[in-house]
């Protein structure tokens, strides 16, 4: 499945969330990650993020699709990094 994760967390937790997500996904811009995940990886990520955040003040949104080709993705400006050749 293809997943996009967007988060707004307290400044004291940003580095922990970003570091964790970098293990599984591509960092495309501040507070946004995307990538191909298995169902097991997706569930593991959701579980770990629940431990890292404070649900009373932080917010994370998960967008998922069977495949990236089903998403209409457009961007403007300079992306953070080229992820087209990452295996």
From Swiss-Prot:
For this protein, the Enzyme Commission number is 3.1.-.-
Does this entry carry the keyword Iron? no
Does tRNA-binding show up as a keyword for this record?
Answer: no
Q: Give the binding site residues for Mg(2+).
A: 8
Q: Which UniProt keywords apply?
A: Antiviral defense, Endonuclease, Hydrolase, Magnesium, Metal-binding, Nuclease
Q: Which domain of life is it from?
A: Archaea
Q: Per the UniProt entry, what are the Gene Ontology biological process annotations, in alphabetical order?
A: defense response to virus; maintenance of CRISPR repeat elements
Q: Which cofactor does it need?
A: Mg(2+)
- Role noted for this protein: CRISPR (clustered regularly interspaced short palindromic repeat), is an adaptive immune system that provides protection against mobile genetic elements (viruses, transposable elements and conjugative plasmids). CRISPR clusters contain sequences complementary to antecedent mobile elements and target invading nucleic acids. CRISPR clusters are transcribed and processed into CRISPR RNA (crRNA). Functions as a ssRNA-specific endoribonuclease. Involved in the integration of spacer DNA into the CRISPR cassette.
Q: How does it assemble?
A: Homodimer, forms a heterotetramer with a Cas1 homodimer.
Q: Which family does it belong to?
A: Belongs to the CRISPR-associated endoribonuclease Cas2 protein family.
Under what name is this protein listed? CRISPR-associated endoribonuclease Cas2
- Report the gene name: cas2
């Amino acid at each position: 499945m293809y997943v996009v994760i967007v988060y707004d967390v307290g400044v004291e937790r940003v580095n922990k969330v970003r570091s964790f997500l970098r293990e599984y996904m591509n960092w495309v811009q501040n507070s946004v990650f995307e990538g191909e995940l298995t169902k097991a990886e997706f569930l593991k990520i959701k579980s770990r993020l629940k431990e890292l955040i404070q649900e009373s003040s932080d917010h994370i949104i998960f967008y998922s699709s069977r495949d990236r080709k089903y998403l209409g993705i457009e961007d403007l400006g300079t992306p953070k990094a080229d992820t087209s050749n990452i295996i």
